[in-house]
Amino acid sequence: MKTLLLTMVVVTIVCLDLGYTLKCHNTQLPFIYKTCPEGKNLCFKATLKKFPLKFPVKRGCADNCPKNSALLKYVCCSTDKCN
């Protein structure tokens, strides 16, 4: 009986997705997010550099933090919904 129970526990663990899946916002609205695909382990937020209010113009998942440009400043983080 114990062997059957142990087997069922092992099968359950193997069948579950135990990998960490990061969730990032992907629109300007802060309550909409998506689960990032495998390999994308950062969330990013882009804001306009010259605009006084720092509204995000782009959000999403990334494998590397995008580089700042003349117009956009990127901020990256690695926890759920941190962008």
UniProtKB/Swiss-Prot annotation:
Residues 1-21 form the signal peptide. GO terms for molecular function: toxin activity. It is found in: Secreted; Target cell membrane. Expressed by the venom gland. One of its GO terms (cellular component) is extracellular region. Gene3D superfamilies: CD59 (2.10.60.10). Non-cytotoxic protein that does not show lytic and hemolytic activities, but can induce aggregation and fusion of sphingomyelin vesicles. It binds to integrin alpha-V/beta-3 (ITGAV/ITGB3) with high affinity, and it inhibits osteoclast differentiation and bone resorption in mice, probably due to binding to integrin alpha-V/beta-3. This is Cytotoxin A5.
